[in-house]
Amino acid sequence: MTVVSVEHALAGKIPEGGEVTVRGWVRTLRGSAGLAFINVTDGSCFAPIQVVATDTLPNFDEIKRLTSGCSLIAKGVLVKSQGKGQSFEIQASGVEIVGWVEDPLTYPIQPKPMSPEFLREVAHLRPRTNLFGAVTRIRNCLAQAVHRFFHQNGFNWISTPIITTSDAEGAGQMFRVSSLDMVNLPRTAQGEVDFSRDFFGKETFLTVSGQLNVEAYCLALSKVYTFGPTFRAENSHTTRHLAEFWMIEPEIAFADLAEDARLAEQFLKYLFRAVLDERGDDLAFLAERVDKNAISKLEAFINAPFEQIDYTEAVKLLQNSGKKFDFPVEWGLDLQTEHERWLTEEHIGRPVVVTNYPEHIKAFYMRLNDDGKTVAAMDVLAPGIGEIIGGSQREERLDVLDARMAQFGLDKEHYSWYRDFRRYGSVPHAGFGLGFERLVVYVCGLSNIRDAIPYPRAPGSAEF
C-alpha cells in the first residue's frame, strides 16, 4: 500500500481506485449514523483530505472520539468525492490512531478564530493552524526560489560567518558573543574588560550583515550571494523589526547601480511568479482571510515596469504633494514609510527605485558620487509596504573609502582586510540586501513581521 502526501492525493497524481495510506493530523471530525468524516492534513498543502470511516471498522468507537490535533494513519481506497469542494477522498479500510490530544478542552489550537497575538504565545503549535501552515509553505517556496534564481543566473552561494568582529552597517547595534564569566569578568590594568582572555582572543559579535564578507568572494567569483541569519540589537518594539532575521545579499562584480537595480527587479518578479505558480491554494486562503489583494498585488507587481527617480526628485514630489505627513520631508533626511508609500501608491502607482541618497544617511561603503553630496545607493519601494530592498554600488577607490571610514569614525586598521579588496585588483561592484521576513510579510499580507518567522526574536522576547 502506497504512502502518499495529501497534496498528491488531492491533485489526482495517484490512480483512482488505488489503495493508499496517508499520515497526518485531524483538522475536524463530524459524524452521522454509522459514519465518521475525518478531515486529515499532513501540511503538504492547504486543503485536508476527507477520510470516510464506517462502523464496520473494529475501532470505530475510538475513531468517533478523535478531536482536532490527534495524529493518525489512514489506509483505504482513493475515490472521487461527492462532497462540495473536494476532488478525492479515502474510503478507509483502517484507521490507526497514533497520538491523542491529552485534553481537547485545553488544547491551545481550537477550530475557531485565534488572534495572532495569542498564537505568538504558542509559537511552537501555531504551524498547525491554517494561517501559519500557509505562511510556512509560502516562506519555503520563496526560499527555494531564491536559490533557484541565483543558481540559474550563475551565482555562487557563499556561507558568510555568523560570528564577526566587524560592524557592516556602522550603527553599533550588535549582540556581543562571549564565553567569559559574566560574574567574574577579567580586567585589564585600566579596569576594562580583557577580551584577550575571551574565546576568540578579541571582542566578537553576531553579524548584522554578510555583505562585507561576501564582497571578498564577489571579487574572485564575479557573481555571488549569501542567504542567512543576521542580528540587530535594536530596541524597537514595532511591527516591522526583529532582532533575528534572514537576509538575502547578492553581489556582482564589474557592475554599477543601474545593473544592480535591474537585478533587483528581475529577482523580485521571479520570486513572486514562483509563489503564484506553486502556492495558489495558500494565496487563495490569504486573499480570503488576510489580504484581499494577496494575489492581485503580486500579479500587478510582475506586470509593472519599475519607475526610477532620484532622491532629490522624490523629496520635491513629496514637498509639493499637498499631503500632510507625520514626518518632515527635507533634503538630507531619510524617507519614512509614509513617504515611500505615497510615492508608490498615490503618485506613481507601481514599484519605484529611488537612487542617489545623501551621503551622510547611508553606509560608509557606498560609492560617493561626483557631486560629493550623494552616494550611488538605491531603495526599491513596493506599494503596500514601502522599502523592500536596499542596495548600492560599492566604493572601489581606496582613498575615497578611507575618507568615508574616517568620516564615520571607523578604524581603518580594523577593516584592513576589507581595504585589501581595493588594493589588489579593485573593480566596480554592486549589491543589495533583502530582508527575507519583510518579503514574507509583503507576499502574505501580514500586519506584523513576528508572524513571518517560525520563532520571533524581539526585545524582551526569546521564547522557545
UniProtKB/Swiss-Prot annotation:
InterPro entries: Aa-tRNA-synt_II (IPR004364), aa-tRNA-synth_II (IPR006195), aa-tRNA-synth_II/BPL/LPL (IPR045864), Asn-tRNA-ligase (IPR004522), Asp/Asn-tRNA-synth_IIb (IPR002312), NA-bd_OB-fold (IPR012340), NA-bd_OB_tRNA (IPR004365). Signal peptide: none annotated. Its EC number is 6.1.1.22. GO terms for cellular component: cytoplasm. GO terms for biological process: asparaginyl-tRNA aminoacylation. It is found in: Cytoplasm. PROSITE patterns: AA_TRNA_LIGASE_II (PS50862). GO terms for molecular function: asparagine-tRNA ligase activity; ATP binding; nucleic acid binding. Pfam families: tRNA-synt_2, tRNA_anti-codon. Keywords: Aminoacyl-tRNA synthetase, ATP-binding, Cytoplasm, Ligase, Nucleotide-binding, Protein biosynthesis. CDD domains: AsxRS_core, EcAsnRS_like_N. It catalyses: tRNA(Asn) + L-asparagine + ATP = L-asparaginyl-tRNA(Asn) + AMP + diphosphate + H(+). The keyword Ligase applies. Belongs to the class-II aminoacyl-tRNA synthetase family. HAMAP family: Asn_tRNA_synth. This is Asparagine--tRNA ligase. It comes from Xanthomonas campestris pv. campestris (strain ATCC 33913 / DSM 3586 / NCPPB 528 / LMG 568 / P 25).
